[in-house]
Amino acid sequence: MSKKLLFISFVVSLGGFLFGFDAGIISGVMSYVGPEFNLTDGQIGWVVSAPSWAAMIAMIFSGRLSDRLGRKKILLLVAFLYAVSALLSAYAITYEMLSLARMIGGLAFGAALILAPMYIAEISTAENRGVLVSIQQLNIVLGFFAAFLSNYFFNKYNSPEHLFLNDENVWRWMLGVELFPALLYFLALFFVPRSPRWLYLKNKYIEAKQVLNQIHGKNRAEKEISSIEKSIDKDKELQQVKWTDILKSSLRFIMIVGLVVGVLQQITGINAIYFYATSIFKQTGIGTNAAFSSGILLSSVTVLFTFIAMYLIDRAGRRPLLLVGTAGIAISLLLCAFGFSQATYQLKLQDIYHFKFEKSENLIPIAGNEYQNDVDFKEEMKTILGNSTYSKNDGLILEAATQINATLVMVGILGFIACFAFSLGPVMWVLLSELYPIKYRGIAIGIVAFVNSFISS
């Protein structure tokens, strides 16, 4: 495998890094944005999920658009949209402006998640396709790691006395820092060639051969040229592809396989874990600072097991990874469900006396009351303190009130993340890049990715 091929695959997959960074950063941002704009739970949910809804739109059209204009041009547009989203998010002055900014980012990652594995599959050989397409998932989890690390340090140095890093503007820095990897992505894409398979489809044979020679060397390039010509000749026997062609009996089985894997990936709840990681860890009662640092642990486990997946995917095969991983996911989620179901919530009088925030004395009448679930407890807190005051101090309150087997829950969460990272995470994108004939690839992957994003929303 050439260094050139690795470099190109990594650069193209940087859209995945930005997706992971955006998805991870929002878990910490909402701790500040909620009180800043006095958002309801529904509005918080929309700010978090807005990119997923926008991504669905991009997923419908980006594959087809890249078939016409080329993968590289659309990827450049993706990088530009990421940069715009980061700037607008950092300077958002209203809830509506922040939502719009995040939807622009959603358009970017919706297209990036489809086009990166598609492009990599078109420049790689059969022997290394699995590991190269998995770089997309590696970049996603590296993005999560960078986001949780960023959140941790911004939260650590946030102070009411600090001019720039205080509760009113620290979230702007969290969102705005995404601009730097977005610009790097945009500039790096200029060093990426156009897809040789796409060039062949557009009858640009000389440029396609030049690209293959640069990537694989002359000897291997000849073999890849022959493979591309055969696959394209076969595709040209078919009529111009239409959306309805996906329903053909010859494609039905592979469409069902892709859709099942796409749905399964999201019904595990993986995005909810990442989007609300800080809130979930707070709910275990470990405190705000520990919740932010636990996010680093979570993303570190993800990175480690993604590397394991990349090592095994072309050796053990796709199917064994899926079977073992989904079994582990099921067991881990059962552990989490049991742990949270046994949790109770109770504030003691001495806890309330230690609170120094506004209206904390209003909690004295409920001292000693035990709540059997977090929903009732949180609603009571919001009624007594108000939504804004509770949102600013929820970590402190939950740390004092929560009685839970935190170790069991943490084992469940980390087990779930580990099993997902070496199975459904990377394997889905590898499967999608291999399942469909090149003529149908843009539409087919777009449909599966649309359904995948819809489930996550």
PLM features: residue spans?
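Transmembrane-helix signature of 12-pass secondary carriers
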Residues: 1-457
